[in-house]
Amino acid sequence: MKIFLLCIFLILCGTSVWAKDKHYYIGIIETAWNYASDHAEKKLISVDTEHSNIYLQNGPNRIGSVYKKAVYLQYTDENFRTVIEKPVWLGFLGPIIKAETGDKVYVHLKNFASRPYTFHAHGLTYYKEHEGAIYPDNTTDLQKADDKVQPGEQCLYILHANPEQGPGEEDSNCVTRIYHSHIDAPKDIASGLIGPLIHCKKDSLDEEKEKNIDKEFVVMFSVVDENLSWYLEENIKTYCSEPEKVEQDNEDFQESNRMYSVNGYAFGSLPGLSMCAEDRVKWYLFGMGNEIDVHAAFFHGQVLTSKNYRVDTINLFPATLFDAFMVAQNPGQWMLSCQNLNHLKAGLQAFFWVQDCKKSSSEDNIHGKNVRHYYIAAEEVIWNYAPSGIDAFTKENLRAPGSASEAFFEQGPTRIGGSYKKLVYREYTDASFSNQKERGPEEEHLGILGPVIAAEVGDTIRVTFHNKAAHPLSIEPIGVRVDKNNEGTYYSPTGSGPPPSGSHVAPKGTFTYEWTVPKEVGPTYKDPVCLAKMYYSGSTKDIFTGLIGPMKICRNGSLLANGRLKNVDKEFYLFPTVFDENESLLLDDNIKMFTTAPDQVDKENEDFQESNKMHSMNGFMYGNQPGLSMCQGDSVMWYLFSAGNEVDIHGIYFSGNTYLSRGERRDTANLFPQTSLSLFMQPDTAGTFDVECLTTDHYTGGMKQKYTVSQCGQRSEDLYLYLGERTYYIAAVEVEWDYSPSRKWEKELHHLQEQNLSNAFLDKEEFYIGSKYKKVVYRQFTDSTFQVPVERKGEEEHLGILGPQLHADVGDKVNIIFKNMATRPYSIHAHGVKTESSTVTPTAPGETRTYIWKIPERSGAGMGDSPCIPWVYYSTVDRVKDLFSGLIGPLIVCRKHYLKVSNPIKKLEFSLLFLVFDENESWYLDDNIKTYSDHPEKVDKANEEFMESNKMHAINGRMFGNLQGLTMHVGNEVDLHSVHFHGHSFQYQHRGIYTSDVFDLFPGTYQTLEMTPKTPGIWLLHCHVTDHIHAGMETTYTVLPNEEIKSG
């Protein structure tokens, strides 16, 4: 996964007054844990249940569903004899620790396990001697005692619920945090040592319950990787009937030990999630794990509010912390599932029960009122992913030998090519289904998608569905109120009665669905006028087959009679996804129809499977999508939505223009499985621009289109007045870059963890490259002679491989005098800025060129942003290879005069780029093999282990504590970026101020975070993705005592 992050601001907070002392007696014990629960195994009918045996059945070389684990338990007192029972739905999670702002929490930890562990808290303040995490931090003696609690030993951890760690202004009363063991955090957590910590605003609890909340639940979505557990060897010996036959490196064995679970329960076996209809329910959610842990937690039949926005799906990633509120509706048995379609098949679901307790309903009965009736059929088509046969970006034939597109469009004995039989939704005029509605020019861009279903709050949506295909199908809506008969899917446990007829409509059958839009599912006061939603057929394979369409749910009175949004010139719906044709219901038909030797096709062949993964938008690839055209100055709404699996992490970049979403100014929108966004754009420059996914594999695989902005009679000149002017002299310079100049921190870390690990990324071994690579970087010079480089100051030392940190205010014109001192063509282009042309001209080696970036209002902060927002600049000659070769830097744009008027004190600014530099994609790979490999003649560039050794998990181009210069004083105002900060929380703007200590970053993401350090020490800063931690994406930052603050 390619993860970006750029820039932070700190805010000074007041001192805390301790309110209450709270004591928790926590023991670590070892136990046998059953992922299928001790209840009868529940198999889900809507899911491909053959998968359950892969994970739950033991055998000669399979462990099965029971594993030895270490877990946290709560005891009544310091004698550690009497266990306090926890709710059954917590599974193997530790007990809930709760604190209000101002409380002082004492955690008395006793280790009953057979190896050392610790207790490390997120979201509370602690001094170094109570951190519970082991890494090289210059602590000794008493300050080290907390870092490793040996078997049989005890340790006291003292934690403070400071205001700056507590809920922000716009946060809910209680927010989700976590605690876990932190000797080797990924292995400790995989072994079971993880639990919830809930930090509440002062006076928001009543006898440990949040006021005005009837029920609360904590859920962790995780692919628990038992291959990483400290107890793997023991589990093999105990539960495999022929342990000597186990090959731990076997991929199938490893997959059988990845337990797709909610709180440690798989395949719907989590007990105890029960509530009454009309109960006010608070959900605390978090994710943990690895790159595979891309979760979309979907609450069937319900709609929630999170951060004051209306949601039904919550995206969770490793160490993502969320809370959400719902009023339970619709009595019945509903599924809480991960809508990552691979995870759904593998058992990541739970049931929750909404019981009819005869409470009076809070919702208006709008059934049958303001009916909008749609007639939709599912039918077969032959779909061509690129009708022109041409790559609109390179002008090459899509089957050109050696092109990136050839793998997907080649047709032959065992290749299907670019056309597939698919199923699609299409709209008809009436219930006879004889006259299909023609799509007008404004709908041309919809492509493979079904018709737009539009509704306002107060409406009833009636959909008469006719199945013209040969498979049972349905329509399942997202974001409206449904009952069990109209849900469009079925997943109840075996033996619970026949499925409702709307859950699967037989071939040639017809069913009329009825859904309602009460105000409780409509936009909140913070939401846009229309919420982007979707509908699809209710089986995982159906979506990949093509059955998905857009829906929008709008405020009352906001739509015209034809369903278009008032006061908007254009509306576009985009569905970026990797259509996995291997999962299509029609795969066998496509093999027979399009391959010339179908009997020779091996459906398990990796190259064959890859050729069928179509990286598309609305079913179009490589710029073949029609209809994305608008006029300069138009008011444009973009509705984006996605579905799929863990590869469907999208950073959708709109070149040439910016948009507003939830008050924030951006040009790159992040999408995940079953998420949707509404974006507002007013294009201000005529030309042809790109809309593309910045996830590297998706971009090269064809997930990119063109959109056109025409003058339409408008004046083309830029009338904005640019009063400020800045000039920067930037060169592209080739350097030798060392990702790990010192191995001292890394080796000390492994010594402290008592592990003797080799490093596939940094060790050269026989033919690997090691830690040094030839790269190209942006560097600043004093003037146009490019003779004297600008020396980096102490506060810029942290930038590492990044180019200079450039600054501009709204109203500025920025002149970039760029000299290419490298050996191949490069350029420099920034996100967010306005340029005269949509084309970025390459600069040849030895040449100098001027690039002009204008900073109009639409390049600056939105009303929901921090005053200064980060953008990124890089070379676009070959966006992928240029980036991985090293060309990237930060641009900070502030509101006009912000730094002069509002911020007279100079803040520290830290820009951090979290990126897996894939050196296999560098222009200099061959040079690096020749220069740094001990045996270049033995190198096989296609060897998987060699390729993996060149994926450098770095922060600003440094690994394992090698990033220098992150130093600040207590009370400093600082600008920072990162994923998880030990010791401190930060604030971030999201149309209001929120607090966390973990921030999620995705392709093309930049975010300003604000933090005021309070606690001196050397603290860990790292990515919380398991593989990234082990691969070295971690460093430390230093908080020095403020000499002006007197001790005590």
From Swiss-Prot:
Record keywords, A-Z: Calcium, Disulfide bond, Glycoprotein, Metal-binding, Oxidoreductase, Phosphoprotein, Repeat, Secreted, Signal, Sodium
Binding, Cu(2+) 5: 650, 693, 698, 703
Record: residues binding Cu(2+) 2: 122, 180, 1024
Signal peptide: 1-19
Example GO biological process: intracellular copper ion homeostasis
EC number: 1.16.3.4, 1.16.3.1, 1.11.1.9, 1.11.1.27
Cofactor: Cu(2+)
Binding-site residues for Cu(2+) 1, renumbered to this chain: 120, 980
Tissue expression profile of the protein: Expressed by the liver and secreted in plasma. Also expressed in the hypothalamus, spleen and uterus. No expression in the cortex, heart, intestine or kidney.
Binding-site residues, Na(+) 3: 761, 770, 773, 949
Function: Multifunctional blue, copper-binding (6-7 atoms per molecule) glycoprotein. It has ferroxidase activity oxidizing Fe(2+) to Fe(3+) without releasing radical oxygen species. It is involved in iron transport across the cell membrane. Copper ions provide a large number of enzymatic activites. Oxidizes highly toxic ferrous ions to the ferric state for further incorporation onto apo-transferrins, catalyzes Cu(+) oxidation and promotes the oxidation of biogenic amines such as norepinephrin and serotonin.
Subunit description: Found in a complex with MPO and LTF; interacts directly with MPO and LTF, which allows Fe(3+) incorporation into LTF, activation of CP ferroxidase activity and protection of CP antioxidant properties by MPO.
Protein name in the entry: Ceruloplasmin
Recorded name of the encoding gene: CP
